[in-house]
Amino acid sequence: MLLLLTLLLFAGTVAADFQHNWQVGNEYTYLVRSRTLTSLGDLSDVHTGILIKALLTVQAKDSNVLAAKVWNGQYARVQQSMPDGWETEISDQMLELRDLPISGKPFQIRMKHGLIRDLIVDRDVPTWEVNILKSIVGQLQVDTQGENAVKVNSVQVPTDDEPYASFKAMEDSVGGKCEVLYDIAPLSDFVIHRSPELVPMPTLKGDGRHMEVIKIKNFDNCDQRINYHFGMTDNSRLEPGTNKNGKFFSRSSTSRIVISESLKHFTIQSSVTTSKMMVSPRLYDRQNGLVLSRMNLTLAKMEKTSKPLPMVDNPESTGNLVYIYNNPFSDVEERRVSKTAMNSNQIVSDNSLSSSEEKLKQDILNLRTDISSSSSSISSSEENDFWQPKPTLEDAPQNSLLPNFVGYKGKHIGKSGKVDVINAAKELIFQIANELEDASNIPVHATLEKFMILCNLMRTMNRKQISELESNMQISPNELKPNDKSQVIKQNTWTVFRDAITQTGTGPAFLTIKEWIERGTTKSMEAANIMSKLPKTVRTPTDSYIRSFFELLQNPKVSNEQFLNTAATLSFCEMIHNAQVNKRSIHNNYPVHTFGRLTSKHDNSLYDEYIPFLERELRKAHQEKDSPRIQTYIMALGMIGEPKILSVFEPYLEGKQQMTVFQRTLMVGSLGKLTETNPKLARSVLYKIYLNTMESHEVRCTAVFLLMKTNPPLSMLQRMAEFTKLDTNRQVNSAVKSTIQSLMKLKSPEWKDLAKKARSVNHLLTHHEYDYELSRGYIDEKILENQNIITHMILNYVGSEDSVIPRILYLTWYSSNGDIKVPSTKVLAMISSVKSFMELSLRSVKDRETIISAAEKIAEELKIVPEELVPLEGNLMINNKYALKFFPFDKHILDKLPTLISNYIEAVKEGKFMNVNMLDTYESVHSFPTETGLPFVYTFNVIKLTKTSGTVQAQINPDFAFIVNSNLRLTFSKNVQGRVGFVTPFEHRHFISGIDSNLHVYAPLKISLDVNTPKGNMQWKIWPMKGEEKSRLFHYSVVPFVSNHDILNLRPLSMEKGTRPMIPDDNTSLALPKNEGPFRLNVETAKTNEEMWELIDTEKLTDRLPYPWTMDNERYVKVDMYMNLEGEQKDPVIFSTSFDSKVMTRPDTDSENWTPKMMAVEPTDKQANSKTRRQEMMREAGRGIESAKSYVVDVRVHVPGESESETVLTLAWSESNVESKGRLLGFWRVEMPRSNADYEVCIGSQIMVSPETLLSYDEKMDQKPKMDFNVDIRYGKNCGKGERIDMNGKLRQSPRLKELVGATSIIKDCVEDMKRGNKILRTCQKAVVLSMLLDEVDISMEVPSDALIALYSQGLFSLSEIDNLDVSLDVSNPKNAGKKKIDVRAKLNEYLDKADVIVNTPIMDAHFKDVKLSDFGFSTEDILDTADEDLLINNVFYEDETSCMLDKTRAQTFDGKDYPLRLGPCWHAVMTTYPRINPDNHNEKLHIPKDKSVSVLSRENEAGQKEVKVLLGSDKIKFVPGTTSQPEVFVNGEKIVVSRNKAYQKVEENEIIFEIYKMGDRFIGLTSDKFDVSLALDGERVMLKASEDYRYSVRGLCGNFDHDSTNDFVGPKNCLFRKPEHFVASYALISNQCEGDSLNVAKSLQDHDCIRQERTQQRNVISDSESGRLDTEMSTWGYHHNVNKHCTIHRTQVKETDDKICFTMRPVVSCASGCTAVETKSKPYKFHCMEKNEAAMKLKKRIEKGANPDLSQKPVSTTEELTVPFVCKA
């Protein structure tokens, strides 16, 4: 009672002291003027929108209640040019005014302390009208007393004498309850004089003054935000409806209110609120789409109330001034009112309360309400009453801001009676289905926009309506025959409906898809394709939606189908990540300000059911060794991105459960989502994985790449950079170094911090340069400042041990438009082993050798322990804004491919019809109320169509000759819509300004492909299909527009009469070609659209092609390309190629046939596809080149029609392993019979390098390197009689360079090696290459054409104008004046980075001084293959060349390990391939492929000379040191003789199996292109080279060839030797003809001499705390063990009865295992009880495993006393 009395006294005091702004008994009439317009800003001054005018009457009943009425309302639509801006005054005479359809019913304004707290309206007043009333009444909200002021130090408090104020307040208006900056100041007489409309009744100031109140709203800080948004998943700083969105979006609202008299008692003279919304329509547009609104109230009169407004019938509170949601599907007004609203009991029925007692009662009642609401937790972030109810699976969501939902009087358009949503959807589906068959005109029909309209319409449909629509269409895919052309419209109808349902994204749509799958309507790949898109399209993934998805996932029809199970599982987990785990995505991607959080924070299904289910499935797949399913569940768990997954991955990553390296690598790679949601946690785990040097490089490199996504601290980057100098794994070091150096170059804000750190640690990296085949990370960006676009590309790949092809490739690219990221496109390709793929997948059974080869026998004698082939596993993933596709595979799946391909070929033999359509959308929506109470709507939509229809017929022969005939219509179409506008619900209008762009490609082609692989022929024939002679093949357009759209008219905007495209005044059209041709191009755009015309510039086009979205701007453009044929084209375009080769024989290859000068040869047969010409040119190409092999390519292009032409191009060239000579011949002929135009070009060129290939530097010391070449070009109508260009060139080594090279350390080291008898080790190989450097070029050209000379001279003149070139020109006395000759001389400087170039022409002489090679894209490395510090050049030699040398006393392996060598009389395996273990059968060894059965053996005689055996397949080549300077050669036991002029070749079926030839003075060479090996020897030393195909596939004295020199001493037993002599002896063949030291050492070898190779070892990389367990690791660490530290724990207690299980609502203090209670006490605990069902038992089991679920929000079932420990000790 005392409290009540105190409150009464306080309330009375407040009431007595407060002076009301509204004089009781007075009536105020205000003129209401508002306008809301939209336009494209500077792009056009055309605006479209609506103007409203009305009268507002306000009657002051008492200090807390105002009665009001809006009446005499009128509105007019406008769509016109406003050169003076959107505020241009428009007289009523120029407007078509209509009555505003408002009810005109009176309403109440509830006040408190002079501020508007609530609007009381008639319950029957439409919600759209209520929101407009709020926008009007909101103009009267003036807080001059700081009632809602935020108390901060910066507040400026006004006084009566100095009415200056500045403060911030949290204030509600129709746009939301947001922070408002108040500025109050007196209004000067000058301003009033200049703008008298501000003070329409100046006498009202009395003794006071006129004052101006400025309110600026801060939309970044709001307590109640009203908006609907969808589709911005990748943006971290996005807050829809605010200004935190970079240049993409900005929003402002400013109010100017003029009051008279004083701040405590005043009259509002005028109030104007101006609001502006600016959006980049397509995100990257430079011009903004605008929505501009203004609400203006001006006092018209003030008088005593003569006729009081009637009381409000059926009153209802609307909460506050904030926009209010309603149920768009209800027949009555169901509004969502916040808790602050008064209930019906609080709404006093007497509108004329006047007694102070009643006022006090009301104030106390309000005060009580405020006290209770402030202490209540009802309006938590979990649930707010003003939000719409969460969507159900059966019903469409209540989206109260989107056009189709509020477009008809605030209700969904189906309420209009004019739109039957079912029939309208059906009609749209049939329209689209029919238009898909007129693919050429898809842009004209606006088919893609119709599909978007269909999707939006279906989002308003409930489950029953969708079922009725499906039934009405009478389309069942099970009844469709996919190969029946007569059903093409029905097929299109089904695919349109299917894709529309997929894109709809509502609960009813999902139930439809679920039903399709359960009843088998969609199966396998079609169902998988649908499921893969759902996470991208779902609008409201509520807990019930996800629960239903989970039930579908467990359905056998899904789980038993591999492709469907993979797609569904990954989609389910991606949806969980977006909707439940990733807070950024939860907020940015879904309409949380409309429905609140879609999944309750207290929903533990993710932890109790979803993750455990996936964990069980992973464990089951692991037990069954089902690799595709293992990969699926690894990716699925990683896709969730929740820390809980670490506990699932832990046993596998730490080796407690064995997984393959590939699977562990995928597991680490799947942590990418965790790096986004919890970067610190992910960083810790990834860093520990990286530090484990015993882990495989694939796993570690993947960890490195992901680690960079977590923005590691500087100290961590420093550690990693330093560690590159210590880590022995080149793959990992290469990944770290390349990634850090790539990061250094980035400048964009996103990478700025990490780039700065990378630059600071760069100096700590190892200086070693790594090959590009090793693991690398690249990050590239392109910044387009003028378009506010930054494009990013990330490429990571992990190298292979057994191939140059990476095992893992990850590529992603995305663009940032301001701060808005467009969803990225990611591509991932992984394979466990390239060699396994080659061995097990690409080779057919007949290609595998069945007899034991010589190499296998040697491997058996050496008892080589083979490695098991890595099990073949792999996957391919594509993830973009439309779908996520993941295809895991293993050997068993690949084994099925040949059968599948064979079945497909069999199916298309008869040319069956196909019709495949795919429609996809990417959508983003933002909507919120404007300050005029009308919904603002922004949409960004991308609609894409891919279509293939027609027939394919194929015939394939066993010898890979095949014929394919097809009649196909291929279509790709894309429509991008960026639209800004607002909705007027009372007249079902949507006013829009936007930019639409279209890209359309159509190819209706009849194609015939004939490939004859044995003969090397291929021919394409291409015709346009019949009936398509005038078809549109290409369309591109950008159309800015404004539109006054009737929402009930479900037609594309381009077909609306209210749409006005912004065609520029200087628009012009261009048609090409001017004359008739097979194609016609029409271009339409503005003359001033320079960017469009600049695309003709090849350089700018090339620069923009990688980023095609930057090629357009906002200006109008339209490009169409048509076929322009008069009738059916019966003759095809023919493109044919022929390839042939020829092994040249004597006498053609005799050296005397080589001529020092090459002459262009005119073929005797110039017809297309001439075998005679090909043979002639091959013979000429190989003439005079020893052991040459010639090749020829013959191309023919025939174009029929009016401009018939025949083009022939033939190129022939030769190569030789024996001589350093080469020749190239070319013939080009163009014939156009109808125009009698023929043209020919004949080219002949040759090159010769001397000395020829040398291996030993001592052979080179006295020889001068040089290169001679010449080119002969003849051209004209007949090249035999036409003009000629003759070019001769020489490259030489200057004496200066020779002297410089001779003084380098490389040469000196080689000389020292030669003194010890070692002449071919790597040092001397470098010396040979270094000594062959050429630095002088001299070229002379005979040019008879004056035009060509003039053109060349003009080019020189243009070069001279380049700023960074130092050029001197002499035109007065040119050296070649009067001659038809051009000379070019160039000389490199001593550092080989600059050149002096002198050019002499008949017109001028030019001297280019110190030309930097880098300016022209060349580097020193392009000139050299090696370098030395003496030349100031580094890293030119590849340190890991694929060569192995056995020199006089030392050897070097393939991987560069150097060791002393002494062979003795025993044969030793220098290099041999060996069989592998079949991973599917550990007892079986796989045979070595026939073309990889290679062994090289060597031994020494008493003189220290080396005898060598080479076993290539079934051939045996033996090299025996001879009495002369070169070894004797035996092939299969038969002695052969080779000399400088005579080589030996073994040829089978025009293929050289191997050839033997002389190299230099004393070396013999052997090369086999078939086996990819080569050998050079001189009787004392041997050099062996092998291709990358042998990587990690050989053993012997040359090492294991895995590009890692640390393990080169691997012995036959797969262990490592320490001592070189042990390693050498281990490869001795001791079974026969073996004696001496090698035999003794080999026999004495013990097991301890050979160390077993350490296999990969996993370690503890996930701690207890990181896996979510109780941290027990810290308790035993350190010198001072705190055994009691973790004795006290908290555990949820469980009590079980017969029918219930009860859980403590909060964890209870307990003693840990191994600890006991020292002291106890009793304490009451609340329990929540559940029925004993499956859910309760699952929760119990989870608690028993250590979980402590949060049950604090559950209802209390009972309270019991528990005895709990007070102190626990171990």
UniProtKB/Swiss-Prot annotation:
Location (main, coarse): secreted
Disulfide linkage: C178-C222, C1444-C1598, C1466-C1634
Coiled-coil ranges per UniProt: none
Annotated ranges, domain VWFD: 1442-1635
Keyword Glycoprotein part of the UniProt annotation: yes
UniProt-annotated glycosylation sites, renumbered to this chain: N296, N1067
Induction section of the entry: By MRJP1 during the differentiation of honeybee larvae into queens.
Residue span, Vitellogenin domain: 22-809
Distribution of this protein across tissues and organs: Accumulates in the hemolymph. Represents up to 70% of the queen's hemolymph proteins. During the first week of the worker adult life, when it becomes a nurse bee and performs brood-rearing tasks, the vitellogenin titer increases and may account for up to 40% of the total hemolymph proteins.
Residues of the signal peptide: 1-16
GO cellular component, one term: extracellular region
Function summary: Precursor of the egg-yolk proteins that are sources of nutrients during embryonic development. Involved in the differentiation of honeybee larvae into queens.
Protein name as annotated: Vitellogenin
Source species of the chain: Apis mellifera (Honeybee)
